[in-house]
């Protein structure tokens, strides 16, 4: 994108281009040739006849009369010719004089034009230098503004660092609170010891408890050693704090030395600035002198131009007069020539004596020609002299031009010196500004360091007081311990209970230590992140400087457009006033609409609350009814089973009695064959009855099992429906939160002039909400099955996962996590996710949460390949694993044998409730298998892997979710569970485990 996009009024808009003046070069003047050519002189031609045949044939009398007449005519003609020749000669002289004047005036004009061109070039050069200086001034102003922006950015960074320091101080206060809690625990221990002493007073008589007392003695010594280790740790912390204090003192002294050096540099710089200011004043005086000379030259140029214009006017007038006179003379000449020809014809016809007169006239004409030739030679000599003078003038001109060039060179050198001095001045002024800014920043840092030193001293004093108190308490405890050594031998059975409490205390202390260690690690990570951010900011600074240099050029163009924009802004101000009046009306309408929307939202919220209450009541009633029905059914089934068992036992007992009554001694007693037959018949009847009763019993069991399966399936469906409703409710609540935030933004913006843009409204959304695209693993093996993209929304209470944006619009999430059940959020390492690619690892992060905080849709997994024995199949809550039975086992669904010694049929076993069944039942989708009776442990922890689009987004998500983690652990959950079940503990608990769903994993 270009740094500046100018507004164009049309396709032929060239207002953004500068009008460049064409460089008018010096006019080419060819020198006058010194050799005489003669092509500028007029040609005069005449004709004559050499034969005298006309004279021989004429009479002498006729010749005399004609000669008299011809003489008179000839004299008149000669007079006219003389007059004409004199006029011609005068006009030729005038013409030569005018031509000489024109040449001299042209030479003068050429000189003046050259001088004017040189002065124009000098003026243009000066104007260009002035414009360059102005541009440099604008660039310097732009740089100053940029440095101010950079200073503001550094101030913001410093504020951020101060905020982090404040957070670290808060953590220190938390540690102090922990130490106070330990003191309270010590007080509790002392109270318990007093109770033990009272118990010892009561039970001194018993001597059998000596061994137990010795054990308690050793345990107390261990507790004292633990307290001593705690004391040592506190002493070490105190030493660390003292070392940090000494380091801060050293830094303070170093900063003071740097400040003094900078003050010295500042004094030196101020002296340099004074010298430069003196130089600037001298240069300004020189510039004024040059300007004065320029003004004089311009005045002379104007006078010369006026003279030139006047001479041009005179020249034009003379040319017009000469042309007019030449034309009139040519016309007269033509008329006289014609008349002369006519008279010649007449004279030839009438008189032959005129030829003699002509010969005389010709002689006279030859004399005149000779005179004219002599005059011409004189004129040529004059021309040669004039050319010599011209050559001398050319030499003088060249000398004057060389002098001018020398002067222009001196002028350019002076201008270069002026430019260099101005540049030095600007550089030194920039250095001065930079030094002033650095002094200010260092003074500010020194003040901050002083404040930090005071705070550190206060903290050290508080820690020393705490140390003294602990030492005093230790001394008291040692005294009590020495006094109680004799009494310890007579402690009794109540000590076991107290030992239990002490073990609980130890576990709490361990947990607190682990939490402190985790906080320290997090602080180290934060410091590393800050260092990385510092490096990235340095690179960004370099990029910003390069951008600034490119923007400086754009700034010049923008400042040229500024004047036009100010004029347009005045026009736009009047328009804005009208628009503001219109927008005030729209604001009132929007406020009315806002009030209506708030009312609608309140109504919706009330309806939502009522619906949730109704749902809860209906769920409770349904649960009670289901429990009553199940209890009644269980009681009825138990009664039937008991009665059938009693009947069965009675029948078996009868059979045993009958069998016992038989006498197998044939030799002694020979029973009758009829009695035997009767007994056999009775036995058969009894066996038939038994079989019938067994069949009835089996039918009843199958019926009841089917009913139970149906009830459990209904329960599962209703639970799934309830989960879906809860998920939809959560998504609706997040949408309502977003709408409320937007409404608050609208209510805050009272005037239309301060209405935020679309970008600002997006930026003003509450910090509790974040949304975007994240990827979730399809199954356990990421390398084989890959990732699945989901749209994730984090509201103030829930984390919602959508398959796509349509599901988000329809408020149909695939999974919802409760933020209150979050334990931990962290970026993942190579050891955690060894199946993922190395490029993806910096983008992956892990969420640890309680199982009870998860709510998802029941999506049945795809059939798993037989090769993967570690994978399992989900069906009605079961997690079936494929197995083979070589020992006796029956199917729990169809009661058929499930085993064979050599070729057992394919079987499945639930790894939760250990129900066995044939694989065919699940493949054929038979409804014989009852739902799983064993559910997940609600208090078990679970983790989820999430893949962000980039590393920056991963950091953003992690920091946001870390802020969301509740400080108190979820109710009903063991605090140590997520730590003991960490992903990096053992190979069995690594990510090689099979995931239950697309993202979750049972821990």
From Swiss-Prot:
Residues 356-595 are annotated as: SHROOM3 binding. It is a peripheral membrane protein. The record marks 762-763 as: Cleavage. It is found in: Cytoplasm; Cytoplasm, Cytoskeleton, Microtubule organizing center, Centrosome, Centriole; Golgi apparatus membrane; Cell projection, Bleb. It comes from the Eukaryota. It is an enzyme of class 2 (transferase). The keyword Cell inner membrane does not apply. Residues 647-659 are annotated as: RHOA binding. Residues 598-664 form the RhoBD domain. The modification N6-acetyllysine is found at residue 296. GO terms for cellular component: bleb; centriole; cytoplasm; cytoplasmic stress granule; cytoskeleton; Golgi membrane; lamellipodium; plasma membrane. A zinc finger (Phorbol-ester/DAG-type) spans 877-930. Residues 1-28, 968-1003 are annotated as: Disordered. PROSITE patterns: AGC_KINASE_CTER, PH_DOMAIN, REM_1, RHO_BD, ZF_DAG_PE_2. Residues 71-341, 660-751 form a coiled coil. One of its GO terms (molecular function) is protein serine/threonine kinase activity. Belongs to the protein kinase superfamily. AGC Ser/Thr protein kinase family. Protein kinase which is a key regulator of actin cytoskeleton and cell polarity. Involved in regulation of smooth muscle contraction, actin cytoskeleton organization, stress fiber and focal adhesion formation, neurite retraction, cell adhesion and motility via phosphorylation of DAPK3, GFAP, LIMK1, LIMK2, MYL9/MLC2, TPPP, PFN1 and PPP1R12A. Phosphorylates FHOD1 and acts synergistically with it to promote SRC-dependent non-apoptotic plasma membrane blebbing. Phosphorylates JIP3 and regulates the recruitment of JNK to JIP3 upon UVB-induced stress. This is Rho-associated protein kinase 1.
